[in-house]
Amino acid sequence: MEKFVCDVCGYIYDPVVGDPDNGVAPGTKFKDIPDTWVCPLCKLDKTHFSKVE
């Protein structure tokens, strides 16, 4: 699965792990995360993330 990085703070969203502390279950693809989700470190929305190449 593809990882995504926050362009501002460097947080990496790993779909294998998810973000269970913020309601995103392990195995959730980035595109399937609700638009209301924000980066757990800097609190910016999904538009500030880029795919890790």
UniProtKB/Swiss-Prot annotation:
GO terms for molecular function: electron transfer activity; iron ion binding. Residues 1-53 form the Rubredoxin-like domain. One of its GO terms (biological process) is alkane catabolic process. Pfam families: Rubredoxin (PF00301). Fe cation binds at residues 6, 9, 39, 42. InterPro entries: Rubredoxin, Rubredoxin-like_dom, Rubredoxin_dom, Rubredoxin_ET. Keywords: Electron transport, Iron, Metal-binding, Transport. Binds 1 Fe(3+) ion per subunit. Its cofactor is Fe(3+). Belongs to the rubredoxin family. Rubredoxin is a small nonheme, iron protein lacking acid-labile sulfide. Its single Fe, chelated to 4 Cys, functions as an electron acceptor and may also stabilize the conformation of the molecule. This is Rubredoxin-1. It comes from Clostridium perfringens (strain 13 / Type A). The lineage of its organism: Bacteria, Bacillati, Bacillota, Clostridia, Eubacteriales.
